[in-house]
C-alpha cells in the first residue's frame, strides 16, 4: 500500500521495568547479547521505547503476539448502514457523558475536517474506508485537537463523534520530535501496554495514572525538532499524561513527539474498542490478551487507524482554547521533558 507509514519490529520482546517510563520518541538500537535483549536498566528508557508488561497468565511478553488479519468487512447494506448510524449517534452521547475534556466543534468545521480526513485516507489508498471509526489528530500549534469520526458507507460524509484537546510534539529541545504525519495502523504487531503509574525522577507520571492504556504505533520516521532537523526513527504512541501536572496543558504542543490525551478520553477509546479491530480479531482467533480488560463494551464498528494532519492554521480558533493561566505553574522542574 503506497505511502502508508511502515513500522519496524525492533522489539520482539520488551522486558518489564519498574520505574515510570515516558513516551519513546527517539531512535534506539537494541543489541541482543547471546540471544537475550538488554534489560530496561541497561538503557535510558526516557529516551527509548517503554517496554510492555509481561502477561502474568502465560508468561509471554504481550509484544510477541502474532497479528491476525481481520476478516474483510463488506460494504454495509442500507439496513445495516442505518443501524450503524444509530449506533454512532448513541456513541456520540456516550462520548459526551464519559469524556470530561471535550471541544465543541462548529458544524462547518466538523465538515471541513471530515473532508480533510477523506483526502488523507485517499492519499494512502484508503479512499473506500467506511463502516469503522477513525481517530484524527490535528497537530497544528494553534489547534492541538483529536477528533473521532465515523461513516457507514463510502457514499456517506464523515460524521464527528467527539473531539478533545491533545498535546503533540514541541520542537526546539533535544530529543523532541514533531509528531509524525500520516495514517498509522493500530495493530497487535506493536502490542499496547498499560501504565504503572509511578513517577519518574522529575515527579511526573509520564504515561498517566496506573492502568492507563498506551496505544503503541511502532517505529516510524520522525522529524527531529532540534539541531539541523532531519529524520530519525522514533517510537510513536498515543497515551494519557500526568493527571495532576500535565493534563491541564492539553491544547498546546508539549510532548516529545507522541500524542498526549486526557485520561477520560483514553478510557473511552479503550472501553469501547474504538480502534481495536485488529485486537478483537486476535481475540476472536482464540488468543487471550492481558492488555484488554474484561467487561469492555466494544463497538462492532471498531476501526484501526489514527490519522495525523497539520492544518497549518495561523490563528487559534475559539473552539480550541488555550490552557488556563495557572496550568504552566503546576509543571515541576524538568516536567516538560517527560512524555
Question: Which residues make up each language-model segment?
Answer:
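N-terminal secretory signal peptides that target proteins for export/translocation
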Residues: 1-16
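Alpha-helical and His/Cys-centered functional microenvironments
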Residues: 9, 23, 146
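Residue-identity detector for glycine
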Residues: 18-21, 57
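Bacterial N-terminal signal peptides
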Residues: 21-32
Amino acid at each position: 500500500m503506497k505511502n502508508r507509514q511502515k513500522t519496524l519490529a525492533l522489539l520482539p520482546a520488551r522486558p518489564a521495568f519498574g520505574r515510570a517510563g515516558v513516551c519513546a520518541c527517539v531512535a534506539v538500537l537494541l543489541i541482543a547479547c547471546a540471544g537475550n535483549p538488554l534489560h530496561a536498566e541497561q538503557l535510558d528508557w526516557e529516551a527509548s521505547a517503554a517496554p510492555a508488561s509481561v502477561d502474568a497468565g502465560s508468561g509471554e511478553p504481550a509484544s510477541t503476539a502474532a497479528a491476525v488479519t481481520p476478516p474483510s468487512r463488506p460494504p454495509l447494506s442500507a439496513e445495516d448502514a442505518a443501524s450503524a448510524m444509530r449506533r454512532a449517534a448513541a456513541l456520540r452521547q456516550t462520548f459526551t457523558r464519559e469524556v470530561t475534556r471535550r471541544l465543541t466543534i462548529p458544524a462547518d468545521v466538523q465538515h471541513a475536517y471530515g473532508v480533510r480526513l477523506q483526502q488523507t485516507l485517499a492519499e494512502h489508498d484508503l479512499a473506500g474506508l467506511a463502516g469503522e471509526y477513525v481517530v484524527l489528530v490535528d497537530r497544528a500549534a494553534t489547534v492541538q485537537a483529536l477528533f473521532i469520526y465515523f461513516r457507514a458507507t463510502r457514499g456517506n460524509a464523515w460524521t464527528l463523534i467527539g473531539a478533545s484537546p491533545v498535546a503533540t510534539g514541541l520542537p526546539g529541545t533535544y530529543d523532541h520530535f514533531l509528531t509524525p504525519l500520516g495514517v498509522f495502523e493500530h495493530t497487535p504487531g506493536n502490542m499496547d501496554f498499560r501504565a504503572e503509574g509511578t513517577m519518574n525522577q522529575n515527579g511526573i507520571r509520564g504515561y498517566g495514572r496506573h492502568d492507563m492504556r498506551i496505544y503503541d504505533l511502532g517505529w516510524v520516521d520522525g522529524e527531529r525538532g532540534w539541531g539541523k532537523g532531519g529524520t530519525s526513527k522514533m517510537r510513536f504512541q498515543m497515551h494519557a499524561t500526568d493527571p495532576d501536572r500535565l493534563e491541564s496543558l492539553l491544547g498546546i504542543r508539549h510532548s516529545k513527539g507522541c500524542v498526549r490525551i486526557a485520561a477520560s478520553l483514553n478510557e473511552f477509546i479503550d472501553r469501547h474498542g474504538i480502534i481495536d479491530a485488529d485486537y478483537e480479531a486476535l481475540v476472536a482467533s482464540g488468543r487471550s490478551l492481558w492488555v484488554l480488560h474484561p467487561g469492555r463494551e466494544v463497538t462492532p464498528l471498531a476501526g484501526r487507524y489514527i490519522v495525523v494532519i497539520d492544518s497549518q492554521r495561523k490563528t487559534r480558533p475559539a473552539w480550541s482554547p488555550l490552557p488556563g493561566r495557572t496550568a504552566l505553574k503546576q509543571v515541576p522542574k524538568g516536567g516538560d521533558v517527560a512524555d
